[in-house]
Amino acid sequence: MSRFFVAGYNSDSSSEEEDLLSSDEELLSSSSEGEQETSDDDSLDFDDQSDSDSSDSDSDGRPSGPAYFLKKDFMKGGAGGDSDSDSEDEGRRVVKSAKDKLLDDMNESIEAINVARRSDTWTTVVSEFDKLGRLLVRAGQQSVSTPNAYIRCLADLEDYITATSENEKTEKSLNAAEARAFNMAKQRVRKQIKEYQAQYDLYRENPELFEREESVDIAAPSRSDVPVEDTTGRVLSPVFTILKQIAETRGKKNIDKYEQIKTLEDLLNDNLAKGSVFELISIYQMLLSIRFDASANQNFMPIEQWKNNEADLTSLIGLLESNKDTYQLSELGSTTDDIDIEPVANESGVKAIFGSITSLIDRLDDEFTRSLQNTDPHSIEYVQRLKDETTIYQLIVRGQSYIESITPAEVQQSVEQLSRVVLRRLEHIYYKPDQLIKANEAEAWKGISHESVIVSKDSTPAELIEGLSSFLTKHKNPVYAKHALLFSVYYYAVNNNYNRAKELFLDSQIFNKIHHADSSLQVQYNRAIVQLGLSAFRNGAVEESHKVLNEIVNSQRSKELLGQGFNSKYPNQATTVEKAKLLPFHQHINLELLECVYSTCSLLIEIPALAAATNSKDSRRKATTKSFKSKLEFHDRQFFTGPPESIKDHIVHASIALSKGDWAKAYQLLSSIKIWKLFPDNDDLLAMMKNQLQVEGLRTYIFSYKSIFSKLSLGKLSQIFELEADKVESIVQKMIETNEIGGTLDESKAFIQFASTEPQRSRLQELAIVMNEKVGLLTEKNEKTSSNGYGKKQPQQQQQQQQQQQQQQQQQKDLLQEDNSRFRYANVNTNNDEFQTTA
C-alpha cells in the first residue's frame, strides 16, 4: 500500500521528520567526534543505552510515520536532548574490558570454592575448580598472567585438604560421592601445584607479594649467549639454557618440534669444536629424542630424519668411545637434580651419565622396520631402503661392543641394556643363510678396534649364533632365553641342519609353555616350527615334515600365525598395533612354497595308504587326509581335464600317475614346478624327491597288484623303478615284517610269494561290508532304545575284553596326541594379545 493512503500522514509530519533527521545526524556526528578514543565495549554500551532510550520515547506516544520501522534506533522519537537527560538521570553504566570480566569470573569461582570447601561440599569444589582451570586457559590465550588469587587459592585448598585428611573423623563423615570428589580435588590440586611450582614456592616464602592485584612474574631463562641464573641460583651456560627450555616444552601442545630440531642442530654445530664432552653428550641425547618425538604421530620416520639420527648416533658412540675413561653413557648411571649437573665420578674417575645407547638403537631399528612395513615390497624403493640394514646392523654391533666395554663382567648377565642389544643383533641374522651372515659381519666390524667378549669377530656364522644364544640363555629373564632358542632353531633349519634344530626344539620342551607367551614370541614359535617342517622335507623326513606342517597349513589363519598379514579381516580394519606386529616382507615365509611342500608330503604318504586299504579294517587303521582325498575325488568327477597349470594341478596329476605306479611321470610333473627353485639346494631336493617317488611308487605297485599276482620278481621291480636290487629287497622285507602285505621271499630272494589268508574283495564288496556293520550298530541302538536304554547283558568275559581293548586304544590315542602336540601351532589372538593352544 502506498504511504499516501496511510491514516494520520500529512506533509507537515513529513517535514518534521526531515528536520528531526537532520538534527539527529548533526548530533551523531558531533558525539562521534568526541568519543573517538572510546573502546568497542563503550560503543556497544552506548547502543544499548540508545535502544533503551528510544523504547522509552516510543512508549510516550510520539508520532510515527509510515517509514518509521526503516529508521535507525537513534532516529526514532523526539529530540536527542530528552534521551540524554534521561540517561544522565539514571546514571552512567560501568563498562568492563574482556580482561576485567575474565578476572571477575575467576574471582567468583575462587569465592565459590572457598564457600564450598568450608561446608565440605567437594563435588562443588571439583566442578568450580574445573571451571577455574578453563578460565585460566582462556587467560593464557589472552596473554593474561596467572592471577595471584589463583596461587592463593591453590595454597589454601592444599592446606584445607591436608587438614581434612589428618582429621579422620571429618573424612569418614563424607558420603561416597563427596569422598570421591575429595580424592579428585586432592589429585587435581597437587597436579596444578606442580605446574605452577615456582609461583607456589614463592608464595610460601613470601605471601605478602601475592596480596596485591598485580601478578608476580617468574623470570624465564634468556636465549642470549650470556650465562643466566636459574631459580635455584645456579648460573647456566648458554648450551644448558637452550636445552632446559626445550626440555620444559616436551610433551606440550602447539610446539614446533622441527624448529627445536633446527635449534639443536645449530647448537651442536656451534659447540662441536669448543663445547665440553658433557655438553655434547647432552645435546646429542636431546637432539635424537626430539627427532623421534617429531615422527611419533606419523606412520614412519622420514628417511632424511632417520639418516640424520643414524649419523648423529654414530657420532655419539664415537664420542663416547674416545672419552671412555672420563665419561660413560649407561643405564647404570646416576641421575642428577638438573640437566646441567654432572654426575659424581666413581673410584676410577669415570662419570657415568644416565642414558641408554640400547634404547636409541632400538628406536632407530623400530623406525627402520616401520618404514619397510609402509613401503610397497615389490617396488624399487623397498630394495633401496633395505640396503640401510647393513648400516643399522653395523650400529648394533658397535653399540654392543661399547656396552660390553663399560659394563663390569660380574653384572653382564643381569644387565638389560646388553641383553637387549644382543637380542636385537640376533634378530637381524637368524633368518639369513651363512653366506649373507658372513658378508654382514665383515662389513659391520670395519672401524671397530676392540674385540667382543661374547663373540669374536672371526667367528663362523654357527659360532656366532651359538655364542649370542648362549649369552641370552644365561640371563635371569627367561624371555631372552626363549627368543634365543627359537632364533637358533630357525637358523639351523634354514641352513639345512635339521637334526640339530630338531634336537634343540624337543629338548627345550618349549611347546608345553608357549601358550603363556606374548605375541612376538608366539609368532616366532610358529615360524620356527614351519621352518623345521621345511627342513625335514629337504632332508627326506617326509612323514615328520607332514606332521609338523599339517595343522598350520590347514588352518585358515596362516598369515596371522606367521605374522605376515591378516586372513580374517581386511587390511584397513587392522589397528595400528596389529600392523606393528607384522614382519617386513623380506622376512616372510613363502606360503605357496609351504603349501607345495605339504601337498607333496601328502602325496607321498596318502597314495600308498589308499592303495593299501584293501578292506574295511585297513581303512579304519589308515585314516587318509580328507583334504587331499577330496582333491583327488573332485578331479575324478571332472569330465574334461586339461594339462596342469597351477601347483595344485601338478600335485593332483602326479598323484594319479603315482597311484598307477608311473613314478617317472609323477617325477616329471613335480620337478616342473618352478617354486622348488626357492630352495638353495634345488638339485639335491629334486634328487631326494625322485628317490622318494621311486620307493613309494614301488610300495603302491605292490599294494595295488598283490591281489592279482601270486608272486612278483624282485629283479623286474628293480628294473621298473630303477632301484638297486638290495634296496628293493629291504623295502619288500620291511613291508612283510610290518604286516603291510602277507607273503614271503623265496630262498633265492628273487621272488616275493603272496600268501594271505584275508579274502581279496572288490571295492563293491568292501562297501557292502561297511554298510552291514553300520546297520548292525543301528540295530543295537534301536534295541537299547526299545528297552529303556538297557541292552542285553553281555557275558563278563566279553565285557573284560572290551574294556581291555578300550584301554589299549585310549593309551595309543594319548601317545599319538602327545606326539602331535609337540608341533601344535600357537593360536595368536591379535585383538587382545592372548594366546591359546589349539585343541
Curated annotation (Swiss-Prot):
Positions with biased composition (Acidic residues): 14-27, 34-58
Return the SUPFAM superfamilies for the record.
Winged helix' DNA-binding domain
Pfam families noted in UniProt? eIF-3c_N, PCI
- Composition skew (Polar residues), residue ranges: 827-839
Bias (Low complexity) occurs at 794-812
Checking InterPro entries in the record gives:
EIF3C, EIF3C_N_dom, PCI_dom, WH-like_DNA-bd_sf, WH_DNA-bd_sf
Q: Where in the cell is it found?
A: Cytoplasm
Q: Which UniProt keywords apply?
A: Cytoplasm, Initiation factor, Protein biosynthesis
Which superkingdom does the taxonomy of this entry point to?
Answer: Eukaryota
GO MF:
RNA binding; translation initiation factor activity; translation initiation factor binding
The UniProt entry's GO biological process terms, in alphabetical order, are: formation of cytoplasmic translation initiation complex
Residue span(s) of domain PCI: 585-759
Gene Ontology CC: cytoplasmic stress granule; eukaryotic 43S preinitiation complex; eukaryotic 48S preinitiation complex; eukaryotic translation initiation factor 3 complex, eIF3e; eukaryotic translation initiation factor 3 complex, eIF3m; multi-eIF complex; proteasome regulatory particle, lid subcomplex
Signal sequence region: none
Annotated region (Disordered), positions in chain: 1-93, 783-839
User: Which purpose does this protein serve, as stated in its record?
Assistant: Component of the eukaryotic translation initiation factor 3 (eIF-3) complex, which is involved in protein synthesis of a specialized repertoire of mRNAs and, together with other initiation factors, stimulates binding of mRNA and methionyl-tRNAi to the 40S ribosome. The eIF-3 complex specifically targets and initiates translation of a subset of mRNAs involved in cell proliferation.
Assembly description: Component of the eukaryotic translation initiation factor 3 (eIF-3) complex.
Which protein family is it in? Belongs to the eIF-3 subunit C family.
UniProt name for this protein: Eukaryotic translation initiation factor 3 subunit C
